[in-house]
UniProtKB/Swiss-Prot annotation:
The lineage of its organism: Bacteria, Pseudomonadati, Pseudomonadota, Gammaproteobacteria, Thiotrichales. Its EC number is 1.17.7.3. It catalyses: (2E)-4-hydroxy-3-methylbut-2-enyl diphosphate + oxidized [flavodoxin] + H2O + 2 H(+) = 2-C-methyl-D-erythritol 2,4-cyclic diphosphate + reduced [flavodoxin]. It comes from the Bacteria. Gene3D superfamilies: Dihydropteroate synthase-like, Sulfite Reductase Hemoprotein, domain 1. One of its GO terms (biological process) is terpenoid biosynthetic process. Pfam families: GcpE. Pathway: Isoprenoid biosynthesis; isopentenyl diphosphate biosynthesis via DXP pathway; isopentenyl diphosphate from 1-deoxy-D-xylulose 5-phosphate: step 5/6. Converts 2C-methyl-D-erythritol 2,4-cyclodiphosphate (ME-2,4cPP) into 1-hydroxy-2-methyl-2-(E)-butenyl 4-diphosphate. One of its GO terms (molecular function) is iron ion binding. This is 4-hydroxy-3-methylbut-2-en-1-yl diphosphate synthase (flavodoxin). Belongs to the IspG family. Its cofactor is [4Fe-4S] cluster. Binds 1 [4Fe-4S] cluster.
Amino acid sequence: MGSYMNKTSVVKVGNVLIGGDNPVVVQSMTDTYTADVEKTVKQILALHKAGSEIVRITVNDESAAAAVPEIVKELAKHDCHVPLVGDFHYNGHTLLSKYPECAKALAKYRINPGNVGFGKKKDTQFAEIIKIAIANDKPVRIGVNWGSLDQVLLAMLIDENNAQENPLSLQQIMHKALITSALESAKYAEELGLAKDKIIISCKVSEVQDLIAVYQKLAKECDYALHLGLTEAGMGTKGIVASAVSLGILLQQGIGNTIRVSLTPAPNAPRTEEVRVCREILQNLGMRTFTPSVTSCPGCGRTTSSFFRELTSKVKDHLDEKMHTWKEQYHGVEAMKVAVMGCVVNGPGESKNADIGISLPGSGELPVAPVFIDGKKAHTLRGDNISEEFIEIVENYVKNRYGKK
């Protein structure tokens, strides 16, 4: 962890605690048409199985609002009780009022101050949602987005800034507008009677440096629980790297209580990728452990064979597949470290440092693969069945070390 931890209020969302000293929570969002109950339930189940601890769904029209209670019922049939967050823009006050069962079924409401209402209607419509949240004992995320920022507030801050002797840059004013919108909305929610421990706030942008600057300032100005993430991270490597860099820096500084990685999925790619990235960020920072880690070398001229890459892939896939049952049977197995190395240079050393590791022969080396367990050489594998034999050794290690004594 970093040199300090941003102490915040603790907010209960369904059965999940966010903020305070609680672990950083992984969130995700569906991209199905919410009124299609079957498809939405299927995707929520997949996201939850992948490790999402809270799932947000779009509630944008009456058919979506009417579907929410049915979605919750169907999830319960699968013994899935993941908290669902309703994502409201423009008409949340109307939908929550007209569909009280939707308001009851959701675990949290998300409001965007930039489009909850306009002109004289803004405060009234915001207040309607807050009062419904209070009546149903639900928390609220006040989520400000760069792309839908309150234009009246922004114009006012620009005018005030232009009158200053040493005006701020437009970028700094945008940062100020994001924070002001979030904090003023949160303050108004409290004035309406919503408790501080029912409020989570976020100020999302799409650029790494902007996100870091905004949240560093936001964390100094409040003690609300903070939802962290780029509002649109992008696709593929770009989206993953941008999210890992920005979230990693802030989390290392103790800023952020729950995260979502807003990736643009590649065509036909699983929605669960965003959950995997969240978990990898937290695990690589040492903040959470979800699944055994696999250390493997990148390969070089010494590792002319592709076998070490194939074995690494097989081991990783095996661990991921087994974790669904292992996490219930073997307490602590998620912290296990496995090494699959490709030659004698770093192979034995990395294998000894892992809980269990294998050092495969590189180019010109003897065709044998020593296996190290808890820092000591335990086996020597050779022949055509090294993959199967090593995976069997891993299985036995898990049972012996993490099984109930």
